Design a protein with these regions (language model features):
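Short acidic/polar N-terminal linker immediately downstream of export determinants
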Residues: 17-70, 81-83, 87-103, 120-121
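Extended, compositionally simple hydrophobic/Ser/Thr-rich segments
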Residues: 41-53, 99-102, 107-238
């Protein structure tokens, strides 16, 4: 019985090894290709491409990259969520940057990185309430003007935000950091359950809970402070 089991395992391994994906290598000139999509209020990145959030007509996205790569980029809208990923039938070797420019407006409610790609903005974006999630190794770097912002890091990627908001929530459960020392907020709630660090600019009220090894650095001299520390991390005031 043991021999039969080992034989089956060996056959499965051989089958798995024989199913390696063909590689698509970026070739040719860098071209721009436009696509028209239905409206969306959320953006989710699930691959190694980069996304740039811009002002403009929602749904009119532009793909910039090697001319042979564009057909493999999947952009689909499901229940208001724009998902960006690569075709799963191939492996990819990016010789040039693959960038997708995605217009957004105040209706944007959520941005998620689940992969190695980054999400950035070259302009300040105006939103009402926005949640940003890092679940992989990619980073989020945005300039925002908002009423309420919420950030979650459960991977190794970092989040860097500048701008203004009324209320801010930050939850770290991974090794990634949150850099918000250029994001001015009146009220902030920060929680660390991992090793990532948090930097905040708070002017009125701060609530912080540290149960991991990450540190919280505060500037702005908030009037009300409630800090609970049960891990090895600490709070520093600038």
């Amino acid at each position: 019985m043991k021999k039969i089991t080992l034989l089956c395992v060996g056959l499965l391994l051989l089958i798995g090894c024989g199913r390696s994906l063909p590689v698509v290598k970026g070739e040719g000139q860098v071209l721009s290709k436009e696509r028209k999509l239905p409206a969306y209020t959320q953006v989710r990145l699930e691959c190694g491409a980069d996304i740039v959030l811009t002002h403009g007509q929602v749904g009119d996205i532009t793909i910039n990259g090697s001319q042979n790569m564009e057909p493999y980029v999947i952009t689909e809208v499901k229940n208001g969520v724009l998902i960006v990923r690569m075709s799963p039938d191939f492996a990819y070797q990016f010789t040039k940057k693959l960038e997708i420019c995605i217009p957004v407006d105040e209706s944007l409610t959520e941005v998620t990185v689940q992969g190695s790609g980054d999400i950035t903005s070259h302009q300040q974006l105006q939103v009402k309430e926005l949640t940003c999630n890092v679940l992989g190794s990619g980073d989020i770097d945005l300039s925002l003007q908002a009423e309420s912002l919420s950030f979650s890091v459960k991977g190794s990627g970092d989040i860097k935000i500048k701008g203004t908001t009324q209320t801010l929530g930050v939850a770290i459960a991974g090794s990634g950091d949150f850099d918000g020392d250029a994001l001015q907020t009146k009220q902030a709630n920060a929680s660390i359950r991992g090793s990532g660090d948090v930097e905040l600019f708070v002017t009125e009220q701060l609530s912080a809970d540290i149960r991991g090894s990450g540190d919280i650095t505060i500037k702005g001299n908030p009037k009300k402070i409630d800090v609970q520390t049960k891990g090895s991390g600490r709070v520093r005031y600038l």
